[in-house]
């Protein structure tokens, strides 16, 4: 067993898009945050497990809100004065024969501390589960990604449904410093949205070569 704890601070300035696009507001203030987490980790043989409690408090969180002072009637970027993310992450892995299993679950409460409402476009639940193995010189695997529903607006009036995606991947070393990579994301060509009216990628195939000099 191993226990760890950490605290930290962060700062993020608004981008040019946040300030000067159709949805931008030139007077946006930068974000600042304070983060704290406590974790407990276990490793034994072919198994690992961890549980991490976290809390992140953000001042002037930059997020997309309703109609405001920008040029768009659809909505504008705005600062949320006081926001908080807190929750727990469970992660683990286990080898069964030649198969490596792994997964993680995030349970969080993203909320506006002034209104008590859920932060826009942030889901409360996320999970990833996968498995991979060696087959004929290749590392091949599959993973499932799932997310709970989220609200598109700060008023929590427009709901974006949850989704589940299946991805496949494979890789093999073709030379000392080169690895051939292939991946299919969103195998079932699932339609889903992270922001209303904005499309996400359908089934996507990637092929590439990774160079890692040794």
Residue positions per predicted region:
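Outer-membrane beta-barrel transmembrane domain signature
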Residues: 147, 158-165
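C-terminal beta-signal and adjacent terminal beta-strands/loops
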Residues: 57-59, 146-153, 168-214
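Outer-membrane beta-barrel signature, preferentially recognizing the C-terminal barrel domain
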Residues: 9-59, 66-96, 120-124, 159-161
